[in-house]
Amino acid sequence: MALNACGWSRYSAALAATPYRRASPSRVPPLSSPSHVADTLITDRTQLVDYIASGEKPVQDWRIGTEHEKFGFRLDDLRPPTFDGDRGIEALLKGLTRFGWDPVEEKGRVIALTRDGASVTLEPAGQLELSGAAVETIHQTCVEVGTHLKEVKQVADELRLGFLGMGFQPKWRRDEMPWMPKGRYQIMKSYMPKVGQLGLDMMTRTCTVQVNLDYATEADMVKKFRVSLALQPVATALFADSPFTEGRPNGYQSYRSHIWTDTDGDRTGMLDFVFEDGFGYERYVDYILDVPMYFSYRDGIYHDASGKSFRKFLRGELDVLPGELPTLRDWSDHLTTAFPEVRMKKFLEMRGADGGPWNRLCALPAFWVGLLYDDAALDAAWDLVKDFSLEERHALRDGVPKHALKLPFRGGTVRDLAREAVKIAIGGLQRRARLNSKGVDESGFLDALIEIVEADETPAERKLALFHGEWKGDIDRVFREFAY
């Protein structure tokens, strides 16, 4: 688990220069766990709108919440660890408690950890996710991620495990992936094949890095939502790192991104309505109400409501809970079951990037904070995308999984668009002027993206070159050379 591809030198400098403190409790309930909002009964539709609107914050209270996932593997045979056993995922979670993490159990099994507003949770096949606390700066984000990776490395080494940051599992088949013992996932596992061909791959063989960002007003939310949706394909291209399936090139640079196009059309996509006149909280609530349910959580039990209507739930007509009305916790849970390229809960979640090494786990939040948390940068980003047609937005979304930076666009390529977006983000971070103790601002965290743009080589293309060259077609090399 050497951080050879992750930049230990920058990590060490960040640790030395930035006193790590969590600014506030995380606002991000883990995807894999029920939310913890009040069990207030919903008796009026306005409560649904008010719940989202309650996320509005003054600029001084804006925070950054970064999440990332990674693949575990056994060092001896590279197979993903199961949940059980001396070298299993539960053993890893229990080992991490030595660092002050509190265990979270489901039916007597440790399935998550919490500490100071952050959480460590499990994706369906045991992908390990850190949902970071809500912090003020990218410096703090990067130290948080680095500290987590260091803790995981210490325990994983003892268990002879390693971890890999990529967008898609490069070696193992879907039927070779383990399943975690979590009620929510069993419901999704049964439902996914009914609505798409690749949903089970999404659950078991993908990893991402995401950032959650705040808005001040409804108008601010709308502008940020539109900019981030239009530029999400640019992030997909820059972070493209999933070119292998079952040991061979799959024809994509971000196969993870492609998978979302055949997972579940009812809850994925580019949300064209966000660009329509009059878009706001009300319209987003209408969209979420039309997303079929997965479950309702009551007294420690996940009740299978897959395919059911939340609108019927509001009328007390949910057949698995007859006569019961939903609570705000049900609404909070339901908001997490939509998977568009950008998602709104009480904040906006950027969902377009593949997982990757440590430096790109810092670059992803830096990219979006630079674009969205500075007024001049947000204006410039909006000027860049405001005349994109619906057809162009979809062409970008559909084309970047395969072609990434080399996708033709308006007489140039997505690389040109990415160069301009990164330039805007750099300016935004410089004007934010959030300095570490050495007086360095956050713009340096975009160095990884500058290198990708200038080289015109995505992480996927780099790995493909190695695969066809130095590795001589041996996919096992990716585990040794790109592990954390």
Q: At which residue positions do the language-model features occur?
A:
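N-terminal chloroplast transit peptides
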Residues: 1-19
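Terminal catalytic/cofactor-binding subdomain
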Residues: 28-197, 205, 240, 360, ...
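Loop-rich catalytic cores of soluble enzymes, especially ATP-dependent carboxylate-amine ligases
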Residues: 157-158, 162-343
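Long, well-ordered mid-to-C-terminal structural blocks that present hydrophobic/aromatic surfaces
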Residues: 308-392
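Short, positively charged and aromatic/hydrophobic N-terminal segments
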Residues: 11, 20-33
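Structured core elements
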Residues: 71, 210-214, 349-351
